[in-house]
Regions:
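An N-terminal hydrophobic leader/cap segment in hydrolases
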Residues: 1-8
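A general secondary-structure boundary signal
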Residues: 8, 20-26, 84, 88
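Conserved acidic catalytic loop of the alpha/beta-hydrolase fold
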Residues: 78-92
Length: 92
């Protein structure tokens, strides 16, 4: 499955966040937050359903996964600001 978009976003602090998009490019945006062990490409398995439902899936890699920067001593509470920055970058 080829994603609609596959790129790297550079956060304000310089960290890289790899993300892919699947589904309907003009659909309602939904953040797909993969578990462990996995990566952003896990969202490819819901591409067909997302297209049918008119949903745009945005799937970022967590820190240290694939091409996303590793974050030393990261906490669960570090994830929401990362997702928020990505949403701002995508003008959501």
């Amino acid at each position: 499955m080829i994603p609609l978009r596959d790129e790297i976003f550079i956060r304000g602090n310089g960290d890289r966040v790899a993300f892919s998009e699947y589904g309907d490019v003009s659909g309602e945006p939904v953040m797909f937050c993969h578990g462990w062990p996995s990566s952003r490409i896990m969202a490819q398995f819901i591409d067909d359903a997302a297209r049918e439902l008119g949903v745009r899936i945005i799937s970022p890699d967590r820190p240290g996964i694939a091409e996303s920067s590793f974050a030393v001593n990261r906490k669960l509470l570090d994830w929401p600001p990362l997702v928020s920055e990505l949403a701002d970058f995508l003008h959501l």
